[in-house]
């Protein structure tokens, strides 16, 4: 997917935690200089001896690589701490801005002689285009979005990517595909809003009229797509099913259930995805809860499974039903725990049964047609030939599939906007009005932080960063709180003023400090370079510098992964 390199501000991982960020890719990187000695000195006796610097113009993947390194360095700061519950709290914060309308009142705008515009941004700009075949807004031109009729293309504004909106690149990691499409899926968040001129209707944008955001005309949504499809055609959208992963308000969630009896969409945070053996080891959720496969029986070509949720050894919820890996599933929701069982089978001798499942906690329930948070109602989103239609029903069929969820603003109109104003979108993103000398710039922005608690080995995706708790180093007597380092931008650091060793993420093209080193002949990294870890000894006010880079963002990410493995 195309990624704009100019908008993301910073991603930092900190708080009271012992965690490292999960990175993927090969662990091998070319080493230049004494990289091992540099890595060994990064943290000594619990003290951090490095600053981490990422380029202001870096791609999002470089920023996440910097956050990954910061998280690993932070984990090394901990020598002892409370180990009573075997988990840790991680804070992930991020900021970003979309493109903007430089001056909504400019008479030169294509929409200047109109009185409404529809603004759209998403986690990736592949989803945002208005031209034929380019994105969700293109599909919606002249159609219905929620219950709003989208205007012609001149009044639909592609604000491209708001990069700290969340996306899930693999929405079906277990390959369940219960509708038999033989497709892979992805999912992404988007935000949209309608800006109107103040009434009367004759007050057009080019008259400098007051602006307003009206009830029912601001939106947050999470939509599912077939892989590498971006919403410009009806066939691009993917039907939600239990077990699918989608982002919701910045965190990757599992669709646990579309409850058609009570019209609920139930989501949960994954804690386990795999197979549980009948009368084998129960899956321990902590706090006295465990999941048990009590029995698996053959029923013709399918199987029936008896799955139980235990609390302190006693059954508190259970289901015994047919499952076949082809649409017949078992779902259990009890308090804040959600379980989806997709398939079951027996060993060759018929001695033991097995059940494939995903287990979730921190269950979130959206009551469709009702306020999820103050002034924001929850809806299912159905993909039809008429557009993306809101629904207060959880019913989803092949003909009229539910392809996402949305929150719609139902508060009072926000009007008489002539000066600086920020409109909150679901307490998550913002629509920002910035007036300067009679010009009114408009854009989406985010400045958000999420606290997540992880058990050892658990990973989460939050605000487009993937975090994994590798280990907890502690004793039960004393807790030593620490704060992990936060990656700086190159504009906030310099070689001449460094008082610690520096880790520079990104090569000379995107990191100005790396460019300084390259201009001095201290490093040699270009677009053809492999994943590289290069030390420039004494190059920063007498301190050493480690450049983590490669010829492209994937090679830079691979170099970061190699460094994390060394720390």
UniProtKB/Swiss-Prot annotation:
Q: Which UniProt keywords apply?
A: Cell wall, Cell wall biogenesis/degradation, S-layer, Secreted, Signal
Q: Which GO terms describe its biological process?
A: cell wall organization
Which residues are the signal sequence here? 1-28
**InterPro entries attached to this UniProt entry:** S_layer_C (IPR022651), S_layer_central (IPR022650), S_layer_MJ (IPR006454)
Localization (cell): Secreted, Cell wall, S-layer
| Cysteines engaged in disulfide bonds, as pairs | none
Q: Name one GO cellular component term.
A: extracellular region
Q: What does this protein do?
A: S-layer protein. The S-layer is a paracrystalline mono-layered assembly of proteins which coat the surface of the cell.
Q: Into which family does the record put it?
A: Belongs to the Mj S-layer protein family.
The identity of this protein, by name, is S-layer protein
What organism is listed for this UniProt entry? Methanococcus vannielii (strain ATCC 35089 / DSM 1224 / JCM 13029 / OCM 148 / SB)
Q: Which gene encodes it?
A: slmv1
